[in-house]
């Protein structure tokens, strides 16, 4: 899980990219990066940590340009370290940066292909670098001195043919524009919007629609599975379906946990989805145990709160805040290591004993991944 953003604007985009990354921070806390372009020159700043810690005033002043992309990273594939911070760069052809959210399931096979057949060197164990080099090879194979939108889309089609798994990508080609594409199953989210200015139309591509709302862009729609977008150097938008076969099969965890509740993903409200999850859970509980005897419903902060509220209303019992959250601790799911996750749960949450003493309590969480959080929370509740 990562967060990506790209903006093709009519004025400086550095601060807007930074703001976008802070709004996507829940999608990754390991590293952050921004790349901008001005007059063919690419300007980059990236590093480990939260966006607020990576970017300083001096960095922002150097990130000049009207077009740029950004990334916040949670390492699902590859090790951690500053070399893995995105966007990632390849010099040939043209000079290309990409920011990738997803996982390639055939990354090991592709690494061998990239080295043996494409004659390209990979410097990290990141599957994002694999995807970048495959896109670059497919674009170079078009054999053009200056790539057109058709060349970009042909390269994306080549990626679809070779890459298996999940990928939502935004990229930047020096002197030529910004591109974005989504895997043929639409596993990871990607939407785009526009903003009218006195100088012309600006476009933004983001992981979650909430970023468009905050930056003043009008949501156009989600990129379809297999679809690609290209905004050329003149600011003209091009769209094309690049996959021969495509079907929407999104990751359910986006609506359950990853996304902010105020986002729309594939035209579905995350907030409304979580409300309905709570209602369905309540209906099942009533069906299986009508004499449940529950005194209070307590959500595990923060993602489960919407579902817990709907569940409590359906059951006709009180909703109480039984855990206080330290908001300076990150999301435990995206902590890089089991020991860190267990330690983080105790630092992150503290039980309000008054809400548990002598009561039959129903705890509501959005999901169980490793069980680390659940074990620690039950111990605290007892």
Q: Which residue ranges define each predicted feature?
A:
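Amphipathic alpha-helical
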Residues: 134-150, 301, 309-331
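Extended, hydrophobic alpha-helical segments in both membrane/secreted and soluble proteins
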Residues: 297-300, 304-311, 315, 319, ...
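Alpha-helix capping and helix-loop boundary segments enriched in small/acidic/polar residues
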Residues: 147, 268, 272, 336, ...
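Active-site lining segments that contact anionic ligands and/or coordinate catalytic metals
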Residues: 166-167, 187, 200, 225-226, ...
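Short, glycine/charge-rich flexible loops or terminal/linker lids adjacent to PRPP-binding catalytic cores
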Residues: 316-362, 371-375
